[in-house]
A protein has these predicted regions:
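Patatin-like phospholipase
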Residues: 1-158
């Protein structure tokens, strides 16, 4: 269970009916993770205690405020969100895609303001569902973290 983890763990999901973010600190770890990554339209919502939950990224793509709520005094955020694509936003689907992208960017910017350090891997050619590029994404993350290592060590006083 979540509460039995050696390191404090919080899992963010979005309660589908209210649209509010929920921080799971107790309960079944697997079910909470399943809820947290239930991308709408791709996976069915997870049901916990009679409520439906979907991807926590809808309310907190980088959940800095939830880490602070849990008592974190130093937050290192990893931002993998991309900028809205400069595309033809004509037609219903194009407008919808661009609108969602703009909303996500706004939520993300708000959350990132609360981080002490932001690591930003260069993932410009990769989409959120580009699973074939996962090794390249990992390497980009390592490079971005390495670029921030001096600041990380300074903040950690090591």
């Amino acid at each position: 269970s979540i509460e039995q983890m050696r390191i404090p763990l919080g899992i963010v999901a979005t309660e589908l009916q209210s649209g509010k973010g929920v921080l799971f600190r107790t309960g079944n770890t697997g079910l909470a993770v399943r809820a947290s990554c239930s991308v709408p339209g791709v996976f069915q919502p997870a049901v916990i205690s009679g409520k439906e939950y979907v991807d926590g990224g809808l309310v907190a793509p980088v959940p800095v405020s939830y880490a602070r709520q849990m008592g974190a005094t130093l937050v290192i955020a990893v931002n993998i969100s991309s900028e809205p694509v400069h595309q033809d936003a004509s037609g219903t689907f194009g407008i919808l895609q661009q609108t969602i992208s703009i909303m996500q960017r706004s939520i993300n910017e708000y959350e990132l303001k609360g981080a002490d350090i932001v690591i930003q891997p260069q993932l410009k050619q990769m989409g959120g569902s580009d699973f074939k590029s996962r090794n390249a994404a990992i390497l980009a993350g390592e490079a971005a973290a390495q670029a921030q290592m001096a600041l990380i060590k300074e903040k950690l006083k090591i």
